[in-house]
Amino acid sequence: MADKEKDAVIVDETEHVDVDSKESKKEKKTKQQQKIEFLEAEVKELNDKYLRTLAEAENFKKRIQAEKIMDRKYAASSFATELLVPYEQFSKIVDFPSDNELLNNFLIGFKMIRDQFKSVLENEGVVEIKALGEVFDAKVHHAIEKESNKDKPNGTVLEVLQNGYLFKDRILRPAMVKINEWSEDNGEDK
């Protein structure tokens, strides 16, 4: 009988081991499944970060390319600004009235040179801002003086004190102007 008892104990132990091993296999599978799910989530997150970084790099390249284009487009703006001073001085000289016929003959030639100079500036994108008689626009005009004139609409540019210029679509220098500011209430300057 002792052998039968030993066999019964061994059978009980193996059944107990089988039950434990089944439970541990389930736990292992559950842990492995959790680990797989965790790794899949991590891969998804890393892939998302990668795609975002890739998109940021693409946007950065596009922004740098756009800046290069803008830099090339406006590269001559400082040069054009410096040319405006001698151009305007030259224009004032040739527009100066004279009674001397010999001097007027020279001035005709100089006016032709000035017109060529102006044409070159315009071909490169430098354009004079129209101001005289226009409605005051703070974007392109700078009011230096104001005057009361009942015959002109309020806010009209009465006189250009210094010409303003655009380079392509940027302001090189605003036009310095005298504007009309008149109040109908009291007939005086505002």
From Swiss-Prot:
Keywords: Chaperone, Cytoplasm, Stress response. Gene3D superfamilies: 3.90.20.20, Head domain of nucleotide exchange factor GrpE. It comes from the Bacteria. The keyword Metal-binding does not apply. It holds the Pfam family GrpE. It is found in: Cytoplasm. One of its GO terms (cellular component) is cytoplasm. Residues 1-31 are annotated as: Disordered. Its main location: cytoplasm. One of its GO terms (molecular function) is unfolded protein binding. GO terms for biological process: protein folding. Belongs to the GrpE family. Participates actively in the response to hyperosmotic and heat shock by preventing the aggregation of stress-denatured proteins, in association with DnaK and GrpE. It is the nucleotide exchange factor for DnaK and may function as a thermosensor. Unfolded proteins bind initially to DnaJ; upon interaction with the DnaJ-bound protein, DnaK hydrolyzes its bound ATP, resulting in the formation of a stable complex. GrpE releases ADP from DnaK; ATP binding to DnaK triggers the release of the substrate protein, thus completing the reaction cycle. This is Protein GrpE.
